[in-house]
Amino acid sequence: MLLKKGDNNENVKLMQQKLGIEPAVTNFGPKTEAAVKEWQAKNGLTPDGIVGPSTWAKIMGESAAAPTPIVSAPIAPVGGLKLDKLKGHIPDAVIAMIPDTAAKFQINTPLRLAHFLAQCGHESGGFRVTQENLNYSAKGLAGIFKKYFPTEAAATPYARQPQKIANKVYANRMANGSEASGDGYKFRGRGYIQLTGRDNYTQFGKAIGEDIASNPDAVSSNYALLSAAWFWSKNGLNKLADGGAGDTVVTSITKRVNGGTIGLPDRIKHFKEYYHLLA
């Protein structure tokens, strides 16, 4: 959920009703923005006038981990696209987040959106997983993290201990502290494109006006898609996506997202599926 000045939908009206703004309309104008800022300041939130998942959840009296936005019909277009074409292929809750997220980070053409969703879908196991699974066996560690565990014997003390594994493999990089600091596990991969490392969490927080480094779980619970879009934009992936619909473009994007080409056939398959729907 992301609402800001200029938006016009039923979610805006519902929010206005909760805040006591009269008359409640569907337009998010200056009056609504001022009311949101005032409410945020009174409730210990960043008074930026933007209604993200945390603000929405507090206004609605819900758990911040499970915001339940209203999805108006028809779904808002992005770059001239009707996102309801994606129904049945992507969870409705994800589709509902696309308009504002895509507009914020210019993922607003058939190519860009299809490439973006293909990567998100693969990295998250079909939009089901929002945080990194580090429950590896010794054999798995020696295969995936060979730099840190050159042999199964070296990996055995860490096997099936996700916290120890993360603290080991993510220590002393990405602005994380030492293995003993616990930063590796605290800032492990979250979101649909696995935001990882203190530096990325801090930068993402600045981009949305929240202290995400102090509440990293918000990435998986509230900002799975938005964090992925921020990563996408930060790494210049719109420009790569503009290169076309060929497998070589998917490969180039995959290397930047994954650091390699793990799962490339699945990413290509999903890209073709989404592009066919959106083009």
Label each region the model flagged.
Residues L2-E62:
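Short acidic, glycine/serine/threonine-rich helix-capping segments at coil-helix boundaries
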Residues L3, E62-D100, K104:
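N-terminal export signals and maturation junctions of secreted/periplasmic proteins
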Residues P30-N43, C120-S124, A241-G263:
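Acidic helix/loop microenvironments that form the catalytic cleft of cell-wall polysaccharide enzymes
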Residues G44-P47, A64-A66, H122-E132, G259-R267:
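Secretory-pathway/luminal and periplasmic proteins that interact with or process carbohydrate-rich
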Residues P77-I90, G121-F231:
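Peptidoglycan-targeting cell-wall enzymes and recognition modules
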Residues N108-R112, Y185-R188, Y223-A224, D247-V250:
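Extracellular/periplasmic catalytic domains that process cell-envelope and extracellular macromolecules
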Residues P110-G125:
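Active-site-adjacent structural elements in enzyme catalytic domains
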Residues I208-I262:
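An amphipathic alpha-helical core segment
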